[in-house]
Structure formats: structure tokens, C-alpha cells
A protein has these predicted regions:
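Low-complexity, Pro/Ser/Thr-rich intrinsically disordered segments
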Residues: 34-42
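Mobile, glycine-rich extracellular loop/lid and propeptide segments
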Residues: 43-227
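Bacterial lipoprotein signal-peptidase II cleavage site
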Residues: 25-34
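C-terminal motif of bacterial Sec signal peptides marking the signal peptidase cleavage site
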Residues: 20-24
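Bacterial N-terminal signal peptides that target proteins for export
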Residues: 2-13
Length: 227
């Protein structure tokens, strides 16, 4: 037996319920638009940011008006123990420079010290600056030294052979040791710069005991660590 009118009524009721459901989910044009929560704008805290107070042209160390043709740069910078003097490396001119920042807003150049070789890094321990200097004649025969400079007088007081090309230097917190990375950099023109290329790099540890002339070096091999 067929009930066509009942079937039509059921279909109409189902369609009506579906439309009600869609209307409830989608919302009508009269519904209020959602609003984002109000967030107060933050106020920058100047004490938590780097704020430039001055600049210093390192070229002024070789010419008051930077008129000299001598190329200079400031690559690595360290501060004296009292924080009043900056020491920077200038590999292009083979020098280290000194800047007085007793008044940070008005830095004063104190001159530069010329070295035999390229300074690659500098660190400070006590009254001295420890300068890593690359003296290599070639990639296959790397050499270097640690030059010890008295900061106040800006004079060299000692040298220590490093037996390879140094890249960077750091001093332990207690001031008893200096660690020098002996890079012995590779020749990028050989085999596309691929490694291995000998001699291998290593770590040099300098025992800072006694006067600078009495400091000694210990080497730490870094080969075979991937095995």
C-alpha cells in the first residue's frame, strides 16, 4: 500500500528542519559581529634594548679626517677590565686600535699598534690584551702567534708561538687560561675547498701563570672525533 501524501509531508518536514539547522549554524544578518579583545599597546622599555649613544670612525686613527688611503676596519672588539677602553682588530691595516669610552657619548681614539701579521681576534685578561695574529706564508704552512699587549701603555710585552694559524681567542672566567682556536684554514681554490685538508686545526690552551713572558702552551688535538 502506498502513502504518497505521508511521504511528501515527511520530505517537507526534513527539509524544513535542515534549513533551521543551517540558519542556526550560519547566523542571521541580525546577529552581532564578533569583536576581538582589546589589548593595551605595550610601551617599549629603553633599558631592555640596545640604544646607540655614539659612533667612532676607526679611520680617524690613521687620519684625523679619514683622508688616509690606508684601508682599516674594526672586526673583533674587546673591553678593558674596567670597561673604559675598547681594543679592536683591524686586519686590513694589520693593527689593533684603542678607543677611550670613559664618556660613552664621546669616544676618543687613543691610536693604533701595528703588528707583524694579521690580527684575527682579541681578548682581555687583567691589564693585558691577548691578540691572535696570523703570520702564515701559505695554507700548507700555517703559522701564528699570541701577542700580549699592555693596554694602558699600548705596548707589546710578550709573544707566544702558536704553531698554526689562529682564528679566535677567549679567556676563562677565572683568568687562568686562554683558549685559542687554531683554524689552519683550508684553501678554497683546492678541490672546491672540500675537506680534509692538512694540516688539521686544533685547540691551544695557554696557561696564564706568572708574567706574560712565562706563559706556556698546551695543544688539544681535534682529529678523529667523528669516529
Amino acid at each position: 500500500m502506498s502513502f504518497p501524501r505521508l511521504r511528501q509531508t515527511a520530505i517537507a518536514l526534513a527539509a524544513s528542519m535542515m534549513m533551521v539547522g543551517l540558519s542556526a549554524c550560519g547566523g542571521g544578518s541580525d546577529d552581532p559581529a564578533p569583536t576581538a579583545p582589546v589589548v593595551a599597546a605595550s610601551v617599549p622599555d629603553a633599558s631592555m634594548h640596545f640604544n646607540r649613544v655614539a659612533t667612532f670612525a676607526v679611520c680617524a686613527q690613521v687620519g684625523a679626517s679619514c683622508e688616509s688611503a690606508t684601508p682599516v676596519n674594526a672586526e673583533i672588539v674587546a673591553a678593558s677590565s674596567d670597561g673604559m677602553t675598547l681594543i679592536y682588530t683591524s686586519g686590513l691595516s694589520r693593527q689593533i686600535g684603542f678607543v677611550d669610552i670613559t664618556d660613552p657619548a664621546a669616544p676618543v681614539g687613543l691610536g693604533a699598534l701595528t703588528l707583524v701579521g694579521e690580527p684575527t681576534s682579541v681578548a682581555v685578561v687583567g691589564a693585558h690584551a691577548l691578540v691572535a695574529v696570523n703570520t702564515s706564508a701559505s695554507f700548507t704552512a700555517p703559522t701564528g702567534k699570541l701577542v700580549v699587549v699592555h693596554i694602558a701603555t699600548r705596548t707589546k710585552v710578550a709573544e707566544l708561538d702558536l704553531g698554526g694559524q689562529p682564528d679566535s681567542v677567549a679567556v676563562s672566567k677565572d683568568g687562568r687560561y686562554a683558549a685559542v682556536v687554531i683554524e689552519n684554514e683550508r684553501d678554497e681554490s683546492v678541490n672546491g675547498g672540500a675537506i680534509p685538508q692538512l694540516p688539521a686545526g686544533r685547540l691551544a690552551i695557554i696557561d696564564l701563570v706568572g708574567a706574560p713572558a712565562a706563559w706556556t702552551r698546551r695543544d688539544v688535538a681535534l682529529t678523529g672525533l667523528a669516529a
